[in-house]
Structure formats: C-alpha cells, structure tokens
Amino acid sequence: DIVKYYDGLLLRVPNRQNPEILEEVDKIKKCGMKAAIAVKPATPISEIKDLLSELDMVLVMTVEPGFGGQKFMEEQMEKVKELVKLREENNYKYDIEVDGGVNPETIKTCFASGANVIVAGSAVLGAKDISARVEEFAQIAKEYNI
C-alpha cells in the first residue's frame, strides 16, 4: 500500500467542482494523510475558499507550474496575505506554502507575507554550495520565526 509512505497528498485540480474536490480531500484524510491544494497564478483564492476549512496546506504557485528557473511573481503574495487573513478570521489550521522562483531575496518576501513553507528547487540545486544555501535559507527562516 503506497499510502503508508506518504504523510500528505497535494491536489492540483483543473476544471473540477469543489464538492468533488472535498470528496477527494475526505478520502485523503481517511487514509491518515494531510491534504493540500495548489493554486496556480491565474486562480483566485475565492475559487477554493469553501475548501479551506478542510485543508492542511495551500500551495501558492508564484510561477506557472512545470518549468524550473522562472521569475518569481511577486503579485502572488497578495494571495498569501489573503490566506493568512482567512486563516486568522476563521481559525483555520492550514500551512501556506510558496513554490516558484524562490531565492535568497524572494524567500524574505514570502515569509514577510505570511508563508511558512517554501519550495526552492532551482535556488538550492543550482547553488555552487548546496549546504551553504540550505543553511542560508534556514537562517532567514529563523529571522522570521519559522
């Protein structure tokens, strides 16, 4: 059973209705896993608002998915801020993750906006010293109490 190897599952849901997504989230949680959803740059938070109470994480894409090394879309931080506000107003428990174009400068913007989980593929794997880059990111996270 592959499920025993995972503690979470990310849903990317093009052209599906939220009741169907909620069914998938329920199945994921019944397997003892955490459920997350990815939000592409063109997708407004309003489209997933009715799912937020059930999610463990929301991933805000700051690039178009599928291609590494793209430029960080800073305007997507408005979604992060909106998710923080909704989480606080409704006592939701989800983490806010950012993926795409994250580097030593943009990671600060992510944390300052309210993200608490980061994906930084190209910035880490493309670094001359991967260990030093990871340590740099860890230090920045500490500065933001993450």
Predicted regions and their residues:
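Expand to "…catalyze enediolate/carbanion chemistry for C-C bond making/breaking, isomerization
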Residues: 4, 34, 103, 131, ...
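Acidic, divalent-metal-coordinating active-site segment for phosphoryl/phosphodiester hydrolysis
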Residues: 101-113
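Short Gly/Pro-enriched loop/turn and capping motifs at secondary-structure junctions
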Residues: 64-66, 101-104, 124-125
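C-terminal helical cap(s) of enzyme catalytic domains, especially alpha/beta-barrels
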Residues: 111, 125-146
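Loop/helix-junction capping segments adjacent to catalytic residues or to phosphate/diphosphate-binding pockets
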Residues: 18-19, 45, 104, 127-131
